[in-house]
From Swiss-Prot:
Protein role: Binds to the 23S rRNA.
NCBIfam families xref list: L9
Single Gene Ontology MF annotation: rRNA binding
Protein name: Large ribosomal subunit protein bL9
A GO CC annotation given for this chain: ribosome
A Pfam entry, by short name: Ribosomal_L9_C
Family from the record: Belongs to the bacterial ribosomal protein bL9 family.
Keywords in alphabetical order: Ribonucleoprotein, Ribosomal protein, RNA-binding, rRNA-binding
InterPro entries: Ribosomal_bL9, Ribosomal_bL9/RNase_H1_N, Ribosomal_bL9_bac/chp, Ribosomal_bL9_C, Ribosomal_bL9_C_sf, Ribosomal_bL9_N, Ribosomal_bL9_N_sf
UniProt-listed GO biological process terms: translation
């Protein structure tokens, strides 16, 4: 299916690009999330009329994400979790736990924005985690997992 991207999509293209994707990806994800639109003649004409407005909105989102990223960059989040004597956690620290701790500190972060490349944290100590505030804005945050010995 040919679609017009209404915003930048990772591994696909930028605002205004016309790309071919699988029908299910377009119908079930991109179009419902208002990230794309079918590439018909009418849609292309309407897009060209609204292009400046969409670019302005995209620039505002990027600026807001960069401002939040500057505040968030280099910060440390402490999470208490029950742990054994050897430093392994009972359970793990997930992206939802990290997002919740950041929200308590006053940052608007959703769990889908937290990137844990090695999976959930299972050891006591400091871990580097990335927060994806925008497709172009990645921020490094330190998560200090403090073990409560049982």
């Amino acid at each position: 299916m040919q679609i017009i991207l209404l915003e930048k999509v990772v591994n696909l293209g930028n605002l205004g690009d016309i790309v071919k994707v699988k029908d299910g990806y377009a119908r079930n994800f991109l179009i419902p999330n208002k990230q794309a639109r079918r590439a018909t003649k009418e849609a292309l004409a309407e897009f060209e009329v609204r292009r400046a407005e969409l670019e302005k909105v995209a620039a505002e989102k990027l600026a807001a994400a960069q401002a939040q990223g500057e505040k968030l960059a280099g910060s440390t989040v402490q999470i208490n979790q029950k742990a054994g004597v050897d430093g392994r956690l009972f359970g793990s620290v997930t992206n939802a736990d990290i997002a919740e701790a950041l929200v308590k500190q006053g940052f608007a972060v959703e769990k889908a924005q937290v990137r844990l490349p090695e999976g959930p944290l299972k050891l006591v100590g400091e871990h580097a985690v990335q927060i994806s505030l925008h497709t172009d804005v990645l921020v490094d945050v330190t998560v200090a997992v403090i073990g409560e010995h049982v």
